[in-house]
Amino acid sequence: WMSDSTKQKAIDKLYAITKKIGYPDKWRNYDQVQIDKGKYFENLLSLDQNQYQYELAKLNKPVDRTEWETTPSTVTAYYNPSFNEIVFPAGILQFPYFDFAADDAINYGGIGMVIGHEMTHAFDDQGAQFDKYGNVKNWWTKEDYEKFRAKTQRVVDLYNTFTVLDTVHVKGALTLGENTADNGGIAIAYDAFKMTPEGQDTVTRINGFTSDQRFYLSIARIWRVKTRDAYMRMYVNTNPHSPAKWRVNGPCMSAAPWYKAFNVQPGDSNYLPEDKRVKIW
């Protein structure tokens, strides 16, 4: 749906994404931090003072694009639009996102989905405003951006219909960026999975499930959560991510391979008519 000129700039941005995986090449030195056992408040002050001096030392110096905004042990992943980079610390490269002993379906549905999710952030409603260098700069034709906005509005409208609790619904506008990344992430991970021998195997079953079924079950597994209703009401009003249930069901309900994998038919609870399904990337 994009013109050739906009599509080429999108491809250029995609290939320009910097990948930071595991841990930084240069470690930060904390020798100046004074830590004393039993002095919690004083230790916090020491850390804050060290951080202040660390940030102050950056003044009048070129931006260090090799710097990490998180620690290697943190279980997280993120896309930084200002650096056009995706970051995956060692903390997330473990179960349930990644497991050396697991089959491809499990890993592509786990860490594969997360990788695809962060890549898609480069082209969500916010990332789309940054160029390949991380500058806020328009690289769209007017017509293409209008098409993009129309597609994102369909995502907003769909997620507004998802019920969280009684009369509480997902806030489609608030969660647009993350929903775009969830849908794109699953699509990217699935396409990559289908390039593997296991992904092309439609016969072999493990624990009674086909490879495609295990792929989608792996996605569901990484978002397992148990929350109180009061917390969920607060979450829906403040968090830019959809509730875990809709981070799984929402994208799957728009994914044609999911319908085929589980033989989902009209009348089934999670069936979504084709004209209601959304796809941007």
Predicted segments with their positions:
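Intrinsically disordered, low-complexity linker/terminal regions across diverse proteins
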Residues: W1-W281
